[in-house]
Structure formats: C-alpha cells, structure tokens
C-alpha cells in the first residue's frame, strides 16, 4: 500500500464474531502499529446484545453498538471509514471483536496497513 510516496505492508482480515470470547480479525505485529482504513460490519443474527471492536484482545473498545432484538428487521450493516491515513491502534496490537451475548452474530471485513 502506498501513502504519499511511502510503501507500507497491507493488512486485511475477515471474521465472524459470535461469542463473548475475543475473536482476532487482523493480527498484531511486534514493533508495528496497525492502522485501520475501512471496516465493514454485517449483522446477520441479532439478540439484545452489544458488539464491540477492540484495540487488542480485551483492549479499549473503539466501536460499540447496542442492539435491541425487537424492531430489528432483517440484516443490517455499517461501514467505518477512517480515511487514507487510518485509525491507529496501540503498537503490537491487532483488531479483535466480541459480543456481550452469544446470540449476536456479525461479520467484520477490515482493511488497513502496518507502519
């Protein structure tokens, strides 16, 4: 990936999150910072629960969505766009997803780069 004339290693991941145990979406790399450019979230099965994307396993949640099962009609999706430079996670950390209830299923597709 090229940003303003500099080459960086691209990072991408896709994972289904359906558990309270953190699921790794993009692995962290020792000594590198993961910058996230785009994240697509597709919610296919909802329960009254929250979904979170975190900076590392058990780290700080930078995206959290509470869902109420009643009133959710069919699948829903969200797109997070952090632009050309991206959202920086903590050095060495990867992108993880979790839920507060095993009844909530969502799929995350994420694109970024390591610097």
Language-model-derived ranges and their functions:
Residues 1-34, 38, 92, 98-115:
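C-terminal interaction-tip segments
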Residues 45-65:
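Short, surface-exposed beta-strand/strand-loop-strand elements in extracellular ectodomains
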Residues 52-56, 94-99:
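Short conserved beta-strand and strand-loop elements enriched in small hydrophobics
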Residues 11-13, 62-71:
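Solvent-exposed serine/threonine-rich low-complexity stretches and specific carbohydrate-binding patches
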Residues 71-94, 100:
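Beta-sandwich interaction modules
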């Amino acid at each position: 990936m090229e940003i303003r004339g500099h080459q960086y290693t691209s990072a991408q991941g896709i994972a289904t999150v359906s558990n309270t145990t953190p699921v790794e979406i993009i692995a962290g790399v020792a000594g590198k910072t993961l910058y996230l450019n785009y994240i697509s979230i597709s919610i296919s099965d909802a329960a009254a629960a929250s979904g979170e994307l975190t900076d590392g396993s058990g780290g700080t949640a930078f995206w959290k969505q509470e869902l109420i099962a009643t009133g959710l009609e069919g699948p829903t999706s969200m797109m997070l766009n952090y632009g050309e430079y991206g959202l920086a996670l903590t050095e060495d950390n990867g992108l993880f997803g979790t839920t507060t209830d095993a009844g909530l299923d969502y799929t995350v597709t994420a694109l970024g780069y390591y610097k």
